[in-house]
């Protein structure tokens, strides 16, 4: 599988770190507008599966071209872009996951559900720290 990680900061690094260990992962394209972040990520994750790309996510045409070659895109950038990213994912038939962070944006993403189903695309918004990890830790503490 081919993945696109949007954002080469701490969260993007963590996602890329986990992805390159997957046996079925062919490549992990990591895109960021900050070349210093990309250089640091490549330095810390020297793996042939990692492909750094300088990209501004607001350049929708360039982003769509990149997404069209990918199976799954993971947004590790600010929530402000997630709704537009989800729409581009639908247009390119790319599965999409984001870390969430804003209920209004997530609600807008949920409104794309029917279209996503029709196109056979999975969109999973708000898969960040809470409710994900926080819920698991709460269950663990309760047990």
Annotated model-derived regions:
Residues 54-72, 81:
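Conserved Rossmann-fold cofactor-binding substructure of NAD(P)-dependent oxidoreductases
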């Amino acid at each position: 599988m081919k993945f696109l990680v949007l954002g080469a900061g701490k969260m993007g690094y963590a996602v890329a770190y986990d992805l390159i260990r997957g046996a079925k992962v062919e490549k992990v394209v990591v895109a960021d507008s900050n070349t210093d972040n990309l250089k640091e990520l490549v330095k810390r994750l020297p793996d042939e599966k990692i492909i750094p790309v300088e990209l501004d996510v607001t350049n929708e045409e360039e982003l769509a071209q990149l997404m069209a070659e990918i199976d799954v895109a993971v947004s590790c950038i600010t929530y402000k872009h997630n709704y537009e990213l989800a729409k581009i994912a639908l247009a390119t038939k790319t599965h999409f996951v984001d870390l969430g962070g804003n209920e209004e944006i997530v609600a807008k993403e949920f409104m794309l559900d029917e279209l996503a189903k029709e196109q056979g695309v999975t969109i999973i918004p708000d898969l960040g720290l809470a409710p994900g990890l926080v819920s698991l830790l709460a269950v663990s503490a309760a047990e």
